[in-house]
Regions:
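Active-site-adjacent structural elements that line small-molecule/cofactor binding pockets in enzymes
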Residues: 1-181
C-alpha cells in the first residue's frame, strides 16, 4: 500500500534508474526510494539506453513530468477532466519549454466515446463511422497513436476471444484506410 502522494517522485526516480540500467555496465544508484549497488543488467536493450518510456496523465504535475522525462504521452481523460482539446495547448507549451518538438512528440489516446451511457457506448463500438470520425479527430489533434480499450467491448457482450477478435478486425478494417500513411 503505497502513498499516492509520492508516486510521481517514485516514477521519476524509477525512470532515472531504468535508464542507467540500460546504459551502464554496472549501476550504483542511491535515490530516495531506490538504492542499488554494483548491479548489472544483461542483455542490454538493442536501442542502447533508448527504450521509449511513455507516461500517462493530464493533470498539471503529470504533464510537466511527461514533458520533462517522458518519450511519449499516453493521454487520458476521466469524468470531470477538461476535454483533451483544452489540455493539448498547455502540454505543447511544456514540451517546448523542455526542448521537445510538439509536432514530432509521440502521443497516444484511446479510441473511446468517453464517459457516456452503456447504449451510446455500444453504438460507438458498433458504428464504424463514429469510430473512424473519433480516430480522425485524434489524428487531426496531433495524436500519433491510438488504442482500443477492450474492457468496454467485453462488457458490451464481446465475451469470447473469437467475438472480441472479430470485432477488433472490423474496427481495424474500418480504420486502416483512413489512418494509414
Amino acid at each position: 500500500n503505497e502513498n499516492c502522494g509520492t508516486r510521481g517522485r517514485r516514477l521519476e526516480e524509477g525512470v532515472a534508474l531504468l535508464r542507467q540500467y540500460w546504459e551502464d555496465e554496472h549501476v550504483n544508484f542511491s535515490g530516495q526510494y531506490y538504492q542499488v549497488e554494483e548491479i548489472a543488467m544483461e542483455p542490454k536493450p538493442p536501442q542502447r539506453g533508448a527504450i521509449p518510456i511513455w507516461i500517462g496523465g493530464t493533470k498539471e504535475r503529470a504533464l510537466k513530468r511527461i514533458a520533462r522525462i517522458g518519450d511519449g504521452w499516453m493521454a487520458m481523460t476521466a469524468p470531470g477532466d477538461p476535454p483533451i482539446q483544452e489540455v493539448l495547448p498547455r502540454f505543447k507549451d511544456l514540451l517546448e519549454e523542455n526542448g521537445k518538438d510538439p509536432a514530432t512528440y509521440p502521443m497516444q489516446m484511446s479510441l473511446s466515446p468517453g464517459a457516456i451511457d452503456k447504449d451510446k457506448r455500444k453504438r460507438f463500438y458498433n458504428d464504424m463511422d463514429l469510430l473512424v470520425a473519433r480516430a480522425c479527430e485524434l489524428r487531426d489533434l496531433g495524436f500519433s497513436d491510438t488504442s482500443i480499450d477492450c474492457v468496454p467491448l467485453f462488457q458490451l457482450g464481446f465475451r469470447s476471444s473469437d467475438a472480441l477478435l472479430e470485432q477488433l478486425a472490423k474496427i481495424y478494417e474500418a480504420l486502416a484506410p483512413e489512418l494509414s500513411d
